[in-house]
Amino acid sequence: MSPVEYKKENDLHIIKITGKSRLTPIVRDGEELFSATVQRAQSKAKLTVCINGCWYGLTDSGKADAFVGHDPDPSADTLNEGFALLGTGALHGHSAPNMFYIAQKLDYTWFMGQGDLTKNRGYYTGIGGLCPLVFKGLKYGDGNLYSKELPNAKLTGEPLPAHKPFLTQRNNNRYAALSRLDNRTGRGGIGFTPTADIVVIAQEHGVGSVSFDTFRDTFIKHGCTNACAVDGSDSVFLWYDGGFKFMSAENKDETQTFGIGIRAET
């Protein structure tokens, strides 16, 4: 089996899988707590680590159910901002063209891209609706940053073509919003290195104290040239080494339908 390392660093749970690993989206399509879906998926696919997936909204009936009840919402009431591509070829979710995805081909090659995850790119599995942290070695963050002063440089939006060689950080509005939240906010994400090692990092909501920039930079510190954040706050959960390191909030467990599983291969 590919070597797996776990450590706790500055309130961050860090799992690194060296060597081959398989991306397995976790999808709930019934009416049960998502933690039950995760545990069943983990047992069936022998997943090494599991975290939550993309941002999502709820239908009006889903909001009412979540507000007044303590039972799981029907999966149809959850409106995921992004797609999950299963190994069967099934595609679940909704369009989120401004978000990013992480995907994998059958030969274990990893990819990250912007836009909707689709079936026609040759991907075997994937998960969309994610926030970019670093893409092809370029940091994403709150505002465009450049290596030197440039006249008329754009601080947000698409940099001028002549300025792109000097770009050291690319603005992303979702990232900017997340970076302005309290440092105790839950955070989770997945990244990969040029040699296809996988890094999963998570901070429990209300417990940690790590800024969003530090969270991003920890992926880079561990060699990732591509990494994305999942839905944060009390949506974040982490399953590893036989159980949950921490769980999402009760109302999120009742409404979540997408997660990410990674299996270290033999």
How would you label these PLM feature ranges?
Residues M1-T266:
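Gly/Ser/Thr/Pro-rich low-complexity, intrinsically disordered segments
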